[in-house]
Amino acid sequence: MTTHIVGYFVGSLAKNSINRKLATALVRLAPPGLEMREIPIRDLPLYSYDYDKAYPTAAQALKDALARVDAVLFVTPEYNRSIPGGLKNAIDWASRPWGKNSFSRKPSGIIGTSPGKIGTAVAQQHLRSIMAFCNSPLMNAIEAYI
């Protein structure tokens, strides 16, 4: 049986985040043949193109981790009707430098949970727009706003 590897990002940096709990549940529910690997974002410095010629260790580890997965899943909360800054920072690191976008042609999906009335609907729409620009084929159905 072929094993497919999905790298997942937890958009919240909070240790007890409900999105981290959701990601943990998804890992436990993964069927045989599907391996889930977290791609950590907590230790990334803020992105600047000044680093494009010499990536910091944490940023290079992020790009290396993305190279080892078949697809990406974003498990994200919604902050102020968008994605968390830490997640956007990770996307910026992974998509740079120009011409070395780690998301290009890598399938991705988005899920998230929030105690708010609209869940993570707006954050997911923003993330869809960002990932479309990053040339990542997105799963457009089924959308899940928990």
Go through the PLM ranges and name each one.
Residues E35-L46, N135-I146:
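Mobile beta-alpha loop/short-helix "lid" or hinge segments that flank ligand
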Residues M1-T2, F103:
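Short, flexible coil/linker segments at domain boundaries that flank nucleotide/cofactor-interacting
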Residues K15-I18, Y47, S82-I83, G119-T120:
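Secondary-structure boundary/capping motif
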Residues A25-P31, R128-L138:
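Active-site-adjacent alpha-helix of alpha/beta-hydrolase-fold enzymes
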Residues I5, E35, P107:
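Residues at the starts of beta-strands that form the adenosine-phosphate
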Residues A54-N135:
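Helix-loop-strand module that forms the ligand-binding subsite of alpha/beta enzymes
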Residues T2-P32:
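N-terminal beta1-alpha1 ligand-phosphate binding loop
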Residues P40-A58:
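N-terminal beta-loop-helix "entrance" segment that forms/cooperates
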